[in-house]
Amino acid sequence: MTGERLSVKEFIDIYHSFGDRSGDDFRILFDIPPAFQSVSTLAGNGSGKTCGIRNIIGVLSNGDISICGIGNVEKELLLGNVRTHSLESVWKFDETIRMIREDLPGKLGGVCRRCMFKKSCMGRCIAHTYHRTGKLLDGDLFCGEAYRLGFFPESRLI
């Protein structure tokens, strides 16, 4: 059905059926956490890495400062505006930025806390998690659902 989300199992099955198969003229990108990726995929193209959330700051087109582009939809994650705040002071002293640098990945919740990829994945997209739950460190929602349903790879837990 158009517009409906795939179930976790459907998405994992599709990923496994296509795997690393990309043609010469195209590449298939799956938005799937590294815990579900094959070793060859992880080794071959550097997948499994975070967006760099601990080392970035977002400046939106109106000058607003946020942790990333999520500030466009989550006003609670706006940290100031370049017209009134220096990027340096936001980077050094903002409580949200400080929390991200200090608490990721150690205070991630859910299955992320036990995942062998937590130091590189860092909860995949904490902005998306915030958008859905109101909490930055809740852990990746896809992984959490997969774990609850018994689809999270046990071999990726520590």
Please annotate each region the language model reported.
Residues 31, 101, 125-126:
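Residue-level detector of family-conserved "landmark" positions at structurally sensitive sites
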Residues 106-153:
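Cysteine-cluster motifs in flexible loop/terminal segments that predominantly coordinate metals
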Residues 154-158:
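Iron-sulfur (Fe-S) cluster-binding modules
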Residues 1-85:
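Radical SAM enzyme [4Fe-4S]-AdoMet core and its adjacent flexible, acidic
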Residues 72-118, 122:
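Membrane-interface junctions of multi-pass transporters
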Residues 46-48, 52, 101-104, 132:
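Residues embedded in well-ordered secondary-structure elements
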Residues 14-17, 21, 90-93, 103, ...:
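Residues that form generic nucleotide/phosphate-binding pockets
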Residues 5, 9-13, 85-88, 94-98, ...:
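Generic alpha-helical secondary structure signal
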